[in-house]
Amino acid sequence: MEEIQKLINELGGSQYKDKDTEHYSEEAVELLIKKIDNKSKGKTVIESNTLIYKTLADWSKVEDNRETIIRSPSNVIEKTFQLFEFLLPNGVETLNTDTTVEQSELFSMVCRLLGNLTYENAPNREFIFDKTPSILKYISSFVSQTKYQSLQRTSCAAIANLSSETDFIQLEFFKLGVVSILIDLICREGTTDEVNQMAIKAFNNLVDNENTQVDIHFKEIHRLLGQLKKSLNKEGYYENSFANDLVSSLSTLSLNKDLQKEILKEGFLNDLIELIEESNVHREMINQFEDDDIEKDKDISIAPSTSELIFKLADNDDYRQYFYNKERDGNDANNILDRMIKIMTSPPPAYKDGDSKAQLKALDVAKVKKNITKTIALCSLEDDVIDKFIKTPKIFVDLLVDTEDTERIVNGEMIIGNLARSEPNCRLLNSYNVIELIADIMKKFPNFQPIQHLGLSSIRNLTLPTINKGFKPSSTLMEDVVFNSKVHNQVIQFAALSLIKNFIGCDQSNLKLFLEFPNALQSLLDLANGRVPASMDDESDQQEQLQLDDAKIQEIEEKFEEKEKTIEKTDEKTDEKTNEKKQSKKDMRVIYEATRLLLRFLDNSELSNHQEKMKQLIEESVEPFFSLLQSPFPILQVEGAKGLVLLIKHDKQLFLSRPSWVKDLVEVLSLSIIPFQQLSREQSTITTDPNHQKLIAQIQSNCNFSTELQNVILSNIFYNFSLDESICKKMKDQNVISELKTLKSKQDAPQSLTNLIQKILVQLTI
């Protein structure tokens, strides 16, 4: 012992150590490691070895020494493994009975060395595992023994460092049963705080791997939650490293997909809500700290992180049912939604005058309310919660009142938009004047896109023509709509167009109002002509808020897309041509919807006295109506054709000045035969599949629209033009006769089409 101490003192001299960096030479390390005696059990030898390992552990606190120690020629890792084998000949099973106090102190220093060598050092972890993987078995056994708590603490620390961000070592410790051992240790009565601190760090690192989580179930989670509550009640949350590490572990585990559903079924949300409900007492424990010692960016209670976890769980469509279903005992007090609403609406606690921590406590509460409000907004997407929420509409309307908090406003708009799913609900919400309230808010935050998008979507739901007959938008609301039609975001543009459509459906006089409103017509024409840049990406960092349940009020384009997916079998050549067009063009939904609105204006005779506006409308609608005509959806093609017919009535020269009009119309007529080919093919298929019948019904609907399209183009355009000698000549110059004959001879061309073509051919050849 004295000899070793003397050697250590000598090695501390300048010959072996850099005094500035505390870096020891390879020679010094080698001299010390050679003194390890792994072939004797004498007390003096054990104590000498303990001193050697303690010294090496101290040296390895310096980063530069770790490489020198672990790769020393005498191989300290191999010597250590041999030492374990020699001192524990009967294996780890008899550790509690066979190990002396002196040996436990030695093992403790060995663990300390291994922990220091692998602290933030992945190559050293790999080196140990490659050379002597069995050494992990001994370290694991030191945790499971109950006789020496100091050894438990240092072995836990070693496991924490060895397993940090190292999958293969995490998995090896898991196979040795360490995950379960650590849970038992953490939850055992009588485990000291010092051991617990290290045990939770080891556990935290081990379960950072889904493969090591497979044996953890709700029972284990519940036990850990119990320990967390004990720790919080004793020490609070701030600067409670055990609680912080345990929260980190529970957060990691609660995001395990296989574990999530199990723990939610067993009532995990109830435990989380309880943590929030009990957090006021933990906030008060911050009073034991001096103001200057408190880091302002740290949470002072567990409630903010808990509420954030609750929000993440609610963000999963499959898990929201656990928020509105009563807990297993059926007790109303355990209804998660009711308790969340109570948290959201509760006034902030009153703090004593002169409480210097009052602001910190209030901010902590505010974080919780923000997360819970976001969670409630997500829950409003579910049909099953609407009847509950609509009973207390004012608490949701109040989210929009007297606030500068943009996130609070977005949540309020989202909830109100989702509540507006039925006529009674809309009437009740409108009794609070929410349309104007939202319109004013949108004007107040013009550049905050989530507020604009969800505001437009909410008002769209509240102004459905079936609910709000006779509705007339205010000047503020019109300004909001016009402003958003210019925003470079397709989602917002489409929402603005949906509102214009609603206004017209509510009252035809709104056509005149829109026409007269400054810049309104121009903004609509710009959208229809594709002059406004658009992106599908929301530029805001609050993308998760753009989740209004638009599926409840389906736009016609969604239906078209579904049909398009269902009807995939088409003529090969036509398919190739259509696909080429689709790939070369941008997303056309906004252009289509804006053009459909232009048709409403052209088709209204009461607007004829607005000559300047109508002239502008006619001149700038030619290309949009051709775009609509060339869309992939028969119903839109019909509207495009009708729009062109109206344009021809106002100014046929605008139409005729388009060089390719004959070719464009014939091409659309050619494509209009496809639904008839599809119908013939599907009707010949014998099947009892009910989905096949739906498919046939969809194709039949397309056939009806195609028939109408053929009639509009052939009767109202081609035939009428064939009666005009000057136009007839231009048509012939564009090879119209040959084109129509080819079209007439197509297979599966319906009789109505061939009859109309024949009528036109007769007129053209007179």
Swiss-Prot record:
Subunit description: Binds to small GTPases racE, racC but not rab21. Binds preferentially to GDP-bound racE.
Q: What species was this sequence derived from?
A: Dictyostelium discoideum (Social amoeba)
Repeat listed as a keyword: yes
Q: Which GO terms describe its biological process?
A: aggregation involved in sorocarp development
GO cellular component, as recorded: cytosol
Region of interest (Disordered), residue spans: 561-585
Q: What keywords appear on the UniProt entry?
A: Repeat
Its Gene Ontology molecular function terms? guanyl-nucleotide exchange factor activity; small GTPase binding
The job of this chain, per UniProt, is described as: Part of a signaling pathway that initiates the aggregation and leads to the formation of aggregation centers or streams. Not essential for cytokinesis, pinocytosis or phagocytosis. Not essential for development, except in starvation-induced aggregation.
Q: Please give the knockout or disruption phenotype noted for this protein.
A: Not able to initiate development when placed in starvation buffer. Defect in ability of cells to aggregate in response to starvation. They were unable to form aggregation centers and streams, possibly because of a defect in cAMP relay signaling.
Protein name (record)? Darlin
Q: What InterPro entries does the record point to? A: ARM-like (IPR011989), ARM-type_fold (IPR016024), RAP1GDS1 (IPR040144)
The segments carrying the ARM repeats are: 82-119, 167-208, 423-464, 465-537, 610-649
Which protein family is it in? Belongs to the RAP1GDS1 family.
